[in-house]
């Protein structure tokens, strides 16, 4: 894969830029908010990032439901975890008071794309299986995946040194070779694997920024974990770095952020993109468009990803809504997806859209898609539609008793 070079979202560690962040993020995820934009911060989503079962943590909050806050983005910094080598975004948010909502400025325009022909970030992702870290002393990947990222082998029958840096710039020299139609990394791989304490489902991301005719760009490796580590890493390779924060400390960060948000105080959250649709800092426009949806049980929907503001959405699998939770905002839809989709059955209402049958006969004009500035939000909160004998409310009407005044 290749991604066009782009500037940092803000000052960060200096190595991780927007391209590297997106490469390390879950596929079709990892959207970063623009500085100055208006977003919703979902506490439940923040907790779910660190806890497989977040309910006990949420019960400790002194914040009443639905635990969602309107904020402006003060800063976005891209960093790498000092020990786990995960890329993450540090997002600083300013809560918006109810009386300030009408005076909010429009969202800033998306940053222009980088000019073509410059440096490209080429990368590939390998999701690790048990055999990759329990038995093998070497890493292997299909040659087709590694092409354009790993350099060509000088001698296909011999190994050669390959310098790879982690996301902090620390170098590792692997024995780079070939076995059949696969490339292999040995020597340092076992130590790197043991120090990272990988589990089944974790991923490694190899990245190289290079010109089209240059094979000498620096090679980096990042990590995407399936879930937060529940115990400290052994830390044998990086003795000078701090130990992994225990689960309790990570959970304290969620509680502190929720407390600051409720008090109207500036706070900072760390966002690690680990699975599709896990963003808990969501653009206001996306949430409000979802609030206009009219969904019922058994309604057919399709999942929609929006990786970058201003980019066309990516449409995912279809499914049917089987339940709509009335006591929560985060992942309040239960959906059975078609086929063998591995999508989470719980989805957020702004991540799906109804599948509608459109009459394309010449006598029927195409439906008009309103721009954000054309939508009368007060009308959308009060209008319902006929569904046979049933009045189908908007999502906003379903949730207006739960959501704060400033939503």
Curated annotation (Swiss-Prot):
Output the superkingdom of the source species. Eukaryota
Is Membrane included in the keywords of this UniProt record? Answer: no
Cite the SUPFAM superfamilies for this sequence. DNA-binding pseudobarrel domain (SSF101936)
GO BP, sorted A to Z: regulation of DNA-templated transcription; response to hormone
Q: Which residues bind DNA?
A: 124-227
PROSITE patterns found in the cross-reference section: B3
Q: Which GO terms describe its cellular component?
A: nucleus
Keyword annotations from UniProtKB, A to Z: DNA-binding, Nucleus, Transcription, Transcription regulation
SMART domains named in the record:
B3 (SM01019)
Q: Where in the cell is it found?
A: Nucleus
GO MF annotations for this entry? DNA binding
Q: Which residues form a coiled coil?
A: none
Does the record carry DNA-binding as a key word?
A: yes
> What PANTHER family does the annotation carry?
AUXIN RESPONSE FACTOR 17 (PTHR31384:SF94), AUXIN RESPONSE FACTOR 4-RELATED (PTHR31384)
- The identity of this protein, by name, is B3 domain-containing protein Os07g0183200
């Amino acid at each position: 894969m290749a991604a066009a070079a782009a500037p940092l979202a803000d000052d960060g560690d200096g190595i991780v830029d927007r391209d590297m962040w997106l490469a390390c993020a879950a596929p079709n995820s990892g959207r970063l908010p623009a500085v100055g934009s208006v977003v919703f911060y979902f506490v439940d989503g923040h907790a779910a990032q660190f806890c497989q079962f977040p309910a006990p943590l949420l019960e400790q909050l002194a914040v009443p439901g639905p635990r969602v806050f309107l904020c402006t983005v003060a800063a976005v910094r891209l960093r790498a975890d000092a020990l786990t080598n995960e890329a993450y975004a540090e997002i600083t948010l300013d809560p918006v008071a109810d009386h300030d909502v009408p005076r909010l400025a429009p969202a800033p325009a998306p940053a222009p794309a980088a000019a073509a022909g410059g440096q490209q970030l080429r990368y590939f992702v390998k999701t690790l299986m048990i055999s990759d870290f329990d038995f093998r002393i070497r890493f292997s990947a299909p040659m087709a995946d590694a092409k354009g990222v790993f350099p060509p082998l000088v001698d296909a029958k011999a190994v050669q040194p390959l310098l790879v840096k982690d996301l902090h710039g620390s170098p590792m020299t692997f024995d780079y070779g070939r076995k059949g139609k696969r490339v292999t990394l040995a020597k340092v791989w076992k130590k790197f694997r043991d120090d990272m304490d990988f589990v089944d489902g974790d991923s490694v991301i190899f990245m190289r920024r290079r010109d089209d005719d240059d094979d000498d760009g620096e090679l980096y490796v990042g990590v995407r974990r399936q879930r937060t580590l529940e115990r400290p890493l052994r830390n044998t390779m990086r003795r000078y770095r701090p130990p992994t924060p225990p689960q309790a400390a990570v959970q304290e960060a969620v509680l502190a952020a929720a407390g600051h948000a409720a008090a109207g105080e500036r706070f900072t959250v760390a966002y690690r993109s680990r699975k599709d649709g896990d963003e808990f800092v969501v653009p206001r426009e996306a949430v409000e468009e979802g609030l206009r949806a009219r969904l019922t049980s058994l309604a057919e929907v399709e999942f929609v990803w929006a990786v970058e503001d201003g980019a066309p959405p990516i449409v995912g699998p279809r499914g049917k809504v089987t339940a709509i939770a009335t006591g929560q905002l985060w992942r309040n839809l239960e959906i059975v997806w078609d086929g063998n989709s591995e999508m989470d059955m719980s989805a957020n209402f702004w991540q799906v859209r109804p599948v509608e049958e459109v009459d394309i006969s010449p006598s029927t004009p195409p439906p008009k898609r309103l721009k954000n500035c054309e939508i009368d939000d007060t009308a959308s909160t009060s209008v319902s539609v006929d569904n046979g004998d049933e009045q189908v409310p908007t999502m906003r009407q379903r949730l207006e008793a739960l959501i704060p005044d400033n939503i």
